[in-house]
Amino acid sequence: DQPAERMQDDISSEHHPFFDPVKRCCKYGWTCVLGCSPCGC
C-alpha cells in the first residue's frame, strides 16, 4: 500500500502550473475548477 501513488488519483496539485511550492497551494482561486488546491478559494 503506497500513499504516494494513492495521492495521484486526485489531480496532483504539485504538478499544476500554478502550484506555489512554498504555500503548498495554487496561486489563483479559480484553479478550484482545474483540480488544484487554491490558496484562497
Curated annotation (Swiss-Prot):
The lineage of its organism: Eukaryota, Metazoa, Spiralia, Lophotrochozoa, Mollusca. This is Mu-conotoxin pn4c. Keywords: Cleavage on pair of basic residues, Disulfide bond, Ion channel impairing toxin, Neurotoxin, Secreted, Toxin, Voltage-gated sodium channel impairing toxin. It comes from the Eukaryota. It is found in: Secreted. Belongs to the conotoxin M superfamily. Contains 3 disulfide bonds. They are not added, since framework IV presents two different connectivities (I-V, II-III, IV-VI and I-III, II-V, IV-VI). GO terms for molecular function: sodium channel regulator activity; toxin activity. Mu-conotoxins block voltage-gated sodium channels (Nav). Blocks reversibly sodium channels in molluskan neurons, but has no effect on sodium currents in bovine chromaffin cells or in rat brain synaptosomes. Induces paralysis in mollusks (C.retripictus). Residues 1-24 form a propeptide. One of its GO terms (cellular component) is extracellular region. Expressed by the venom duct. The cysteine framework is IV (CC-C-C-C-C). The keyword Secreted applies.
